[in-house]
Regions:
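Structural preference for solvent-exposed beta-strand-turn elements
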Residues: 2-257
Length: 257
């Protein structure tokens, strides 16, 4: 039995070893001991990695605060930079992003293949230009971690999606609103369909949508820039397409949960 005092609280924890490895770790907390003080809560990673691609939909500059400076965010910044965006860290956790001059519809394949959330570039670029190619997000196995709900949503909006050897490409001459029923509740697909629908013609309804806080955060961010998204945080989300999103706004990433 091991003992430790942390922030004025007495902890006892027991580690049981079996065959040379730890199979169980147990914490026993003895209280009450009053707590006091402050901690800084970082911005939510799952929101940040969706908000950065969402800036591709904006006509202008935006500032995002409370951005966690983690590897996935750093890779996304590099991807957006190589696509033509101007990105500056203007504070400890503050990014100024200008996506006015995006110069390519092919995201760096080597970088997008490094982490799964790069698939948000597909929805955002379909909305912006109607065309995008990325490396297979995170090197994911389509059987083990399917993105079929993403593809289903894009195709119902009017896009043609092709999965190649290590790449995904999508293009559409005109995205049009549609009713999309999610066969499986998917956070990533819900956000991706929102991104693709914001500038589409007409109304898109996502039925059986995921309801996580970072979905609400993405919707709030886009609405701040002029989108018309309703119902985020419920299982039915409606997106009324608008002509464009404006920049010149500041938004803070929701704190981590």
């Amino acid at each position: 039995l091991q003992y430790v005092t942390l922030y004025g609280i007495f902890y006892a924890y027991e580690i049981i070893f079996y065959s040379g490895g730890i199979i169980l770790e147990k914490l026993v907390i003895t209280g009450p001991t009053p707590l006091k003080g402050e901690v800084e809560i970082s911005g939510a990673k799952n929101a940040a990695v969706a908000l950065l691609p969402a800036t591709l939909l904006i006509d202008g500059v935006c500032t995002i605060t409370n951005v966690p400076n983690i590897s996935d965010v750093q890779i996304l910044c590099k991807i957006l930079g190589e696509m033509g965006a101007k990105i500056d860290w203007t504070g400890k956790n503050e990014l100024k992003i200008d996506t006015t001059n995006i110069t390519t519809t092919q995201a760096p394949l080597d970088l997008t293949s490094k982490f799964r959330a790069s698939y948000y570039l597909i929805g955002a670029m379909l909305g912006r230009t109607g065309k995008i190619e990325v490396g297979m997000p995170g090197g994911c196995n389509l059987g083990a971690r399917p993105i079929d709900q993403h593809i289903k949503g894009f195709e119902l909006l009017g896009a043609n999606v092709e999965v190649g050897k290590g790449t995904i490409s999508a293009k559409a001459s005109c995205l049009k609103g549609a009713h999309i029923y999610m066969d499986v509740v998917s956070v990533g697909a819900t956000i991706n369909i929102i991104l693709a629908s914001v500038l589409a013609k007409g109304t898109t309804t996502i039925d059986n949508a995921a309801k996580e806080p970072h979905i609400v955060d993405v919707a709030n961010f886009l609405n701040t820039m002029g989108a018309d998204i309703r119902g985020a945080g419920t299982d039915v989300i409606k997106i009324n397409g608008v002509e464009k999103l404006h920049g010149n706004a500041t938004y803070s990433v929701v704190p981590d949960q």
